Amino acid sequence: MSKKKGSLSINSENIFPIIKKWLYSDHDIFFRELVSNGCDAITKLKKLEMMGEAEIADDEEFKIQILANPKEKTLTFIDNGLGMTADEVDEYINQIAFSGAEAFLEQYKDKTSEDQIIGHFGLGFYSAFMVADRVTIETLSYKKDAKAVLWDCEDGMDFTMSDSDKADRGTKITLYLNDDSVEFANIFKAKEILDKYCSFMPVEIFVSDPSAEPEYQTIMEEELTDKDTVIEHIVEPAKTEEKEKEDGTKETVEVEPEKKKVKILKRPVSISDTTPLWTKHPNECTEEEYREFYHKVFLDYKEPLFWIHLNMDYPFNLKGILYFPKINTEYESIEGTIKLYNNQVFIADNIKEVIPEFLMLLKGVIDCPDLPLNVSRSALQNDGFVKKISDYITKKVADKLSGMCKTDKEEYEKYWDDISPFIKFGCLKDTKFCEKMSDYVLFKNLDDKYLTFKECLEENKDKHENTIFYTNDPVQQSQYVNMFKAEGIDAVVLKDSIDQPFISQLEQKNENVKFVRIDADLNDSFTEEISEDELKDATEKLTETFKKALNRDQLDVKVQKIKDEKVSSMITVSEESRRMQDMMKMYGMSGMDPAMFGGSGETLVLNANNALVKYILANPEGENTDIMCKQLYDLAVISHTPLNPESMTAFIERSNKILEILSEK
């Protein structure tokens, strides 16, 4: 062909500055785009060969080579795919083939949000100009009698086309990096980026530095293949030893035979796992493979609890693996990672428009060929197809969890403490997930037995219908726990911060059901009857005595005959008041006066059956009454919640004082 010059066919010269600035939020994305193009060229050639429209040698090995040359400041991408003719270069490269280019420029020239532009109009190849001042393409089509073409473009607009001496089918793209982008010619940087985007592409990918000193390896002669470049043959002579025979004479014996080795150029190693685990059928995968894949991809030394293998062909193509990681405490970070792929090409992490928000606590990979490589999130938000994908993933996770609970509840219970924050969060965030999982949410009771919501209601049905008692700290609230156990009343343990909004949701969905913390009130199950006159007299006297001793005029005192005589005092806080206080803490309002919202709800309960309380009642002006009142109050608080540092110091000093008083008697 005669040499051809021209400018890229677009009605504005402003396209490449816009591409450079806004098309991609990550400038290293050009690696993915160019490698993906090469992968597509190979895939299309394979399909043409299957249809009898192309011929491929039986021993052909498809691959993509990347040459990172820091000395020349170049990056070269080579594939042995279907290549292009001069006409195809003119059509696909010289003409930026999308409609409405002027409208596109008008819409985006003043925009500053890359989300509005990413992935529009399929401009993948042109991402090369984000990092290169000059790009060349050498290509030879698979078509019979095709001639090789050289395309050369500087500054992203003016190009020349001419014949090339390229003899092998495929495409070679060379980027002459600009001064701001020479780091990409470093082989270690190139490998890092390729590992990010191309670790699982279906074609082998090899990276090398042509300017580096060659590396060698030594193999046995029988391991030599036609692909190896031989440097030299090495013969290691047989090893012998001198041994004494029975008659006392000595002889030389061969202990190791002669070894024939070959020194060769170091064999290249592909950075791509062409058949990642998610592409296989679940029946073909072993537990060990699932665990190895998890450690490799997520660099997590801990073992995953279990996993879900997604494998769907209709009504859309979707494959993937979701792992449930082990979380040691609720304070440990539970931020997961869901990697999204398109035909084994990495797109992005944690795209919430595709992956339901609550699944972001998991770790996994999702591969959906029907999603574009580059797509604006604003477009995804209103995409019905994407909503179907999200709903399907949610359904599969719910099916796995509910199925495990139904078929192997013991195993499900073993995982429950680790997965409960995830499931509860899912129920709060996703209505459909909540509907599927509501019968499989478990609550651990005081005997470490796991119960469903319905079973919890059955436990106390005879004594407290539609009430579920709970404790958020069984150790701190052990006095209350012991009283509940003594009366045969069950309670569940709710330790996680997500439990409060979760039980509020359950109460909204089940209007007659109430969750009540075990220190909210002392009901008739724990007390004996007391006459009104006795109650009134004791309450008035003890209230006056304790208010004076504690110097708290607003103290709310309640006198009851608690069955357990050893219990002297307790603190109760109404469920409504406590939830209000929790909400205030959550929203940073803990410094505000609870009285603004109806008081603290805290009540000091004194046991009229206890000897110490009886003594104070009989001796309101006694020598030690003041110190006893303070001590009983702090003991009540300690059984309810930790003392603050100042109160704890006073409690310790007072305890020492009481011991001194006792020692003097």
Language-model segments: which ranges?
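GHKL/Bergerat-fold ATPase module in large chromosome/replication-associated machines
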Residues: 117, 135-158, 178-182, 188-665
